[in-house]
Amino acid sequence: MALDKDIVGSIEFLEVVGLQGSTYLLKGPNGENVKLNQSEMNDDDELEVGEEYSFFIYPNRSGELFATQNMPDITKDKYDFAKVLKTDRDGARIDVGLPREVLVPWEDLPKVKSLWPQPGDYLLVTLRIDRENHMYGRLASESVVENMFTPVHDDNLKNEVIEAKPYRVLRIGSFLLSESGYKIFVHESERKAEPRLGESVQVRIIGHNDKGELNGSFLPLAHERLDDDGQVIFDLLVEYDGELPFWDKSSPEAIKEVFNMSKGSFKRAIGHLYKQKIINIETGKIALTKKGWSRMDSKE
């Protein structure tokens, strides 16, 4: 018998009709048969036969309906960020707070595979239930984000650097949403590389439009851009996990061998990096600061 999918992927009141071993038997509003494992109950809740309780209903991999009192972060009516657990040829598998992972199909991901999310990234999704009662993650569309973002109508955020995640990636630019709900567009001319879908990145705000959407940049301010020597040092710091055993008292020979520059050029370069708060200079070493790492995170 085909299962009624109206309740699947949503929070509903179900009646407890029995107990088999460690599994409660529940009845949906349309007569659906739903199972509840005791491991999915609230610790302080005791269920009584004949009473109704609130549950989230989801299908297992074979389409059989199960319930949980551990409410997920998203439902088929609610969008939120969900953590990517892994990717494979079928797509990205995400954690939505249920006993099982949920698949975002490969067809919904960027055509360029290097822009696919990686484990630890976060996708803005809701739940989708197909005709066979299988559950998938659905990426937020532009129209969805239009109805959920927090508009900004002043310049208070201009030149501020905030963290955001791309929910849509196109050649023309990157569309991002921050934890505070700010909607940000970064034109292709304001980036050196394209961020992954769902990647946490640092974006500098450069303006806003009449709709309250922010415009951003992954490029540093002109006066913060590195000269050739500074870029060499910065790139080596990134390559060696943020620290190098060199400072202004290192020998000219060692500096020349590693950086291919004179000691005078090296001292000027680390001085500029220090003034821009990109590095700290300590006894015997230089190290990237949090701001320095953020340049890497924002694709400098």
Curated annotation (Swiss-Prot):
Top-level taxonomic group: Bacteria
InterPro entries per the UniProt record, alphabetical: CvfB_fam, CvfB_S1_2nd, CvfB_S1_3rd, CvfB_S1_st, CvfB_WH, NA-bd_OB-fold, WH-like_DNA-bd_sf
Cited Pfam families: CvfB_1st (PF21191), CvfB_2nd (PF21543), CvfB_WH (PF17783), S1_2 (PF13509)
Alphabetic keyword roster: Virulence
Function per UniProt: Contributes to the expression of virulence factors and to pathogenicity via both agr-dependent and agr-independent pathways. Involved in the production of hemolysin, DNase, protease and protein A. Contributes to virulence in silkworm-infection model and murine model of systemic infection.
Family as reported in the entry's similarity comment: Belongs to the CvfB family.
Protein name stated in the entry: Conserved virulence factor B
Organism this protein belongs to: Staphylococcus aureus (strain NCTC 8325 / PS 47)
